[in-house]
Amino acid sequence: MGEIAVGLNKGHQVTKKAGTPRPSRRKGFLSQRVKKVRAVVREVAGWAPYERRVMELLKVGKDKRALKMCKRKLGTHMRGKKKREEMAGVLRKMQAASKGE
C-alpha cells in the first residue's frame, strides 16, 4: 500500500523506534539528587558576599548595575544574567513570605 519503489518515501514502511536520549543531551539538566544537595549546601552556607550585594542592588532597583557585578564575578554575560534572575527570584520569594506573615 505505502511501499513505492522511487522517491523520498521509497521502501518498506516501519514504525520508528523511540530511543533513549544520548548522555550528551542531558548536559545542564539537574538531577533530583544534585538539586537537593545544592539546596542543603545553600541552606548551611548561605549567600556569598557578592550575592548579598547583588540582592541589595536589586532591592533599590539597580538591575543593570547588579548585572554588571554578576558578570564581573562570574565571567560571562549569560552566567551573569542567570545569577541576576536567581537573586531576583530569591527576593520575590522573600517578599512573598513576608507578605504572607
From Swiss-Prot:
Transmembrane segments: none annotated. The keyword Ligase does not apply. Signal peptide: none annotated. Keywords: Ribonucleoprotein, Ribosomal protein. One of its GO terms (molecular function) is structural constituent of ribosome. InterPro entries: Ribosomal_eL36, Ribosomal_eL36_sf. GO terms for cellular component: ribonucleoprotein complex; ribosome. The keyword Ribosomal protein applies. GO terms for biological process: translation. Coiled coil: none annotated. Residues 1-31, 75-101 are annotated as: Disordered. It holds the Pfam family Ribosomal_L36e. Belongs to the eukaryotic ribosomal protein eL36 family. This is Large ribosomal subunit protein eL36. It comes from Ulva compressa (Green alga). The lineage of its organism: Eukaryota, Viridiplantae, Chlorophyta, Ulvophyceae, OUU clade. The gene is RL36.
